[in-house]
Amino acid sequence: MTPKPRVSGRYTAGIQKRRKPNPDQRRRELCDAAIQLLADDGAKGLSHLKVDARAGVPDGTTSFYFRTRSALLHAVAERMVELDLAILQGVADSPGPAGGASASTLAKVVIQTGEEPQLSRTRARYELTMQATRDPAIGATLQRATDAFTKLHHDILVQLLPHGADLAPEVVDDLSNITLTFINGLLLRFAHGDRIIESPEQVDGVLSAIVAGVLGSDQQGGLTHDGAALQPRRKRATPTR
């Protein structure tokens, strides 16, 4: 008898199952698992084997892609920067609220950072920030992200503010620095489980109040630009008769 030919579809399926995963995709998956571990267990709870278990891959997979714990942390920092920049760039590219009928995209993104799955990344980011104080390379990665975030936030603010493009650069610097400081503080409270603000509309309300306060200050343009806010304004000397 002539032997039956092998069923090509079944054979191909078997080959596909044994095919190695895309290395870049596997690295992203491992980094995402590590981010979740950082959020749940902190930096002390991060190890290659725990990442393997969280990602559902065979033992030794993480150490194959990232030989040392330092290499793993650096890759996680890069992955987090990649994810965060993509979200913030989406805010910069989006239109503002139409006619004041809805909250700004920026406010919506801020609230989303306090909700899963982004809440885990918020917590992991603070864990990495602490690691950066002892690892200059991680610090440099996070600083690049911070610089990019600051510029994007600056551009978003100009876009959202009425007549934002007409404001003096130093005034926009003040507004950007102060609102970004508020947002960073809010994210820290979210990371601790403190939902002091619940809705995008509340975020917009606070940001609007901050903007109004800065624009109404006789020190606008010097509140953060050159540290003027830390220096009490000198009183003019009263002329003696």
Residue positions per predicted region:
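Residues in soluble alpha-helical coiled-coils and helical-bundle/repeat scaffolds
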Residues: R67-A71, P97, E116, T133, ...
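Amphipathic alpha-helical segments used for helix-helix packing
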Residues: A103, P117-A140
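Hydrophobic alpha-helical connector segments
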Residues: A75, A86-T122, V172-T179
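Short, basic, alpha-helical segments at the C-terminal edge of helix-turn-helix-like DNA-binding modules
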Residues: E78-D84
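Helix-turn-helix
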Residues: R26-E29, A33-A71, A75
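Short, solvent-exposed amphipathic helices
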Residues: T141-L152
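N-terminal intrinsically disordered/low-complexity leader segments
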Residues: M1-Q25, D218-R241
